[in-house]
Curated annotation (Swiss-Prot):
HAMAP family: Adenylate_kinase_Adk. It catalyses: AMP + ATP = 2 ADP. This is Adenylate kinase. Pathway: Purine metabolism; AMP biosynthesis via salvage pathway; AMP from ADP: step 1/1. GO terms for biological process: AMP salvage. PANTHER family: NUCLEOTIDE KINASE. The lineage of its organism: Bacteria, Pseudomonadati, Campylobacterota, Epsilonproteobacteria, Campylobacterales. Residues 34-63 are annotated as: NMP. It is found in: Cytoplasm. Monomer. Residues 130-136 are annotated as: LID. Its EC number is 2.7.4.3. It comes from Helicobacter pylori (strain Shi470).
Length: 191
């Protein structure tokens, strides 16, 4: 049975980098997928689905639910690793419910934890506007992305707290400290 860890956090919280480093440090047993990377890869293919994804992401809006869930489940199932880290998911209550429904209907993957990398809005803004990764990283789009992240956050936190799988990690520290704490936590579940 594959162990799934969802890593959430504001834009600029470092969730993708944290997950990448943990997967790299434990490459024999941990695979990492960034929802953003999966969607960007699909978008770059310029397929019908890719163009649809691009239309939403270029405006900082959420990609339609069925496209995101399909993309994520396909990544989990195709992996040969026992521990899967996915960052940037869920971003909405609907995404959370859709994944929960899919996970409940099968017995190949079990959700072990949802880890939130917590940072202040100021820290997130400094990091995002300072890195200019792509066309979406300007101030107006940042505020839109922040709103999209914050609006459903309380409900997402409560849902996973009630399932006893929620964990918050302080993202205002050095990357080494954050990665160390998160990696120890993930590995504490064993195989």
């Amino acid at each position: 049975m594959k162990q799934l860890f969802l890593i959430i956090g504001a834009p600029g919280s470092g969730k993708t980098t944290d997950a990448e480093l943990i997967a790299k440090n434990n490459s024999e047993k941990i695979a990492h997928f960034s929802t953003g990377d999966l969607l960007r890869a699909e978008s770059a293919k310029k397929t019908e689905r890719g163009l649809l994804i691009e239309k939403f992401t270029s405006q900082g809006e959420l990609v339609p639910l069925e496209i995101v869930v399909e993309t994520i489940l396909s990544a989990i199932k195709s992996s040969d690793k026992g521990i899967i880290l996915i960052d940037g998911y869920p971003r909405s209550v609907e995404q959370m419910q859709a994944l929960d429904k899919e996970l409940s209907a099968q017995n190949e993957v079990v959700l072990k934890s949802v880890i939130e990398v917590e940072v202040s809005e100021n820290t997130a803004k400094e990091r995002v506007l300072g890195r200019s990764r792509g066309a979406d990283d300007n101030e107006m789009v940042f505020h839109n992305r922040m709103r999209v992240f914050l609006d459903p956050l309380g409900e997402i936190q409560n849902f996973y707290k009630n399932k006893k799988v929620y964990k918050a990690i302080n993202g205002e520290r050095s990357i080494e400290e954050i990665v160390h704490e998160m990696q120890e936590y993930i590995l504490s579940f064993g195989n």
